[in-house]
Swiss-Prot record:
Protein name in the entry: Protein-glutamate methylesterase/protein-glutamine glutaminase 2
Subcellular location as annotated: Cytoplasm
Keywords (A to Z) from UniProt: Chemotaxis, Cytoplasm, Hydrolase, Phosphoprotein
PTM field: Phosphorylated by CheA. Phosphorylation of the N-terminal regulatory domain activates the methylesterase activity.
Catalytic EC class: hydrolase
Enzyme Commission numbers on file: 3.1.1.61, 3.5.1.44
Active site as annotated: S168, H195, D288
PANTHER family: PROTEIN-GLUTAMATE METHYLESTERASE/PROTEIN-GLUTAMINE GLUTAMINASE (PTHR42872), PROTEIN-GLUTAMATE METHYLESTERASE_PROTEIN-GLUTAMINE GLUTAMINASE (PTHR42872:SF6)
Catalytic activity: [protein]-L-glutamate 5-O-methyl ester + H2O = L-glutamyl-[protein] + methanol + H(+); L-glutaminyl-[protein] + H2O = L-glutamyl-[protein] + NH4(+)
One annotated GO molecular function: phosphorelay response regulator activity
Gene that specifies this protein: cheB2
Function: Involved in chemotaxis. Part of a chemotaxis signal transduction system that modulates chemotaxis in response to various stimuli. Catalyzes the demethylation of specific methylglutamate residues introduced into the chemoreceptors (methyl-accepting chemotaxis proteins or MCP) by CheR. Also mediates the irreversible deamidation of specific glutamine residues to glutamic acid.
CDD domains in the cross-refs: CheB_Rec, REC_CheB-like
Length: 352
């Protein structure tokens, strides 16, 4: 099967290191090339071993996982998977801070007789091993972040009824920035499908709520869609918009390998809101959301996707581009500004 996926396991608990290694041993194509008990060792061993993926604990002696993540992403960028025993036992801002610093994903530590947790870990490691990470500078640089974009055509402004979003790997970071920048009087409801381990769904909503002037929470079946409110799709079910002004939560089958599915949400918004739907597909692996974005475009709504330059993984937006489902490609840093312009009735220029 070619070269094995090399993994560095970082955790101050010997038992946890052993359990992680045992879980990864279930896949013959994954090789643990090193283990260590603190962040300082992790930085040194990353430079020496150049692993494909690092599993990172947060709370460790000598150097914690956050500081180690910051050093690694600045000095030797490597896909980092943050592991935690229980999201509810730790302040969510600590775990999610690792994502802000460049870690790619969150996962539950495997326990004895872990079962699904072990296989979820293996699956995540295999996925992250193919991600091309970027260097995260430890000090912000001055000057313009992006060159000016040249418009190739002009789209009419959209009367915004609802904003629906699909995101996966790298999505929490983009959502955090988007929601932290949107004003409290943003005039449309926002509904988001973010692929994440079910155990992290509630803490994700809390983390995003703490950054935003909007009211952010997990969606509940039958609740109203209101301006200034952001609903996060709960795990294990599909979130839909069955009719205007109301959200629905329903059981079903996976779509594009996911439940909740971004495509299911976006298609329901296309049916219900038509031209007043704004669809947004952000960074992520796979193709979820692409067919849903096409449905919004065909219904006369506005179809927006994150550009390759700013994606951790261009899979989902790339699939939308391949389907010719995208009206407008934007940088991940420009999502909030784009939505505000639409809300003000301004036209968007299309360019890559």
């Amino acid at each position: 099967m070619g070269k094995k996926v090399s993994v560095l396991v970082v955790d101050d608990s010997l038992i946890c290191r052993q359990l992680i290694c045992e879980a990864l041993s279930k896949d013959p194509d994954i090789e643990v090339v090193g283990t260590c008990a603190d962040g300082k060792q992790a930085v040194e061993m990353t430079k020496e071993l150049r692993p494909h993926v690092i599993t990172m604990d947060v709370d460790m002696p000598v150097m914690d996982g956050l500081t180690a993540t910051e050093h690694i992403m600045a000095e030797c960028p490597t896909p980092i998977l943050v592991l935690t025993a229980d999201p509810r036992s730790q302040a969510p801002e600590l775990t999610y801070r690792a994502l802000e610093l460049g870690a790619l994903a969150l996962q539950i530590k495997p326990a004895i007789d872990a079962g699904p947790d072990a296989w979820n870990l293996v699956r995540e490691i295999r996925l992250l091993s193919s991600v091309r990470v970027i260097r995260h500078l430890r000090r912000p640089q001055r000057g313009p972040l992006l060159p000016p974009r040249v418009a190739t055509s002009v789209l009419p402004a959209v009367s915004m009824g609802v904003v629906v979003v699909a995101a996966s790997t790298g999505g929490p970071q983009v959502l955090f920035k988007m929601l932290s920048e949107l004003p409290a009087d943003f005039p449309a409801p926002i509904v988001i499908v973010q692929h994440i381990n079910a155990a992290f769904a509630e803490s994700l909503a809390g983390w995003l709520a703490g950054a935003s002037k909007l009211k952010v929470r997990l969606a509940q079946d039958g609740e109203p869609l209101m301006p200034g409110h952001v609903l996060i799709a709960p795990p294990g079910q599909h979130t839909v918009i069955p009719f205007r002004g109301r959200v629905g939560i329903k059981l079903g089958v996976e779509r594009d390998g996911h439940m909740p599915s971004g495509t299911v949400l976006l298609e329901s918004a296309a049916r219900t809101y038509g031209r007043r739907a704004v669809g947004l597909v952000l960074t992520g692996m796979g193709a979820d959301g692409a067919d849903g974005l096409l449905a919004i475009k065909q219904a006369g709504g506005l179809a927006v996707a994150q550009n390759e330059e700013s994606c951790v993984v261009f899979g989902m937006p790339g699939a939308a581009v391949e389907r010719k489902a995208v009206d407008h490609l934007i940088h991940g840093d420009e999502v909030a500004a784009t939505l505000v312009r639409l809300a003000r009735g301004e036209s968007l220029s299309v360019g890559r």
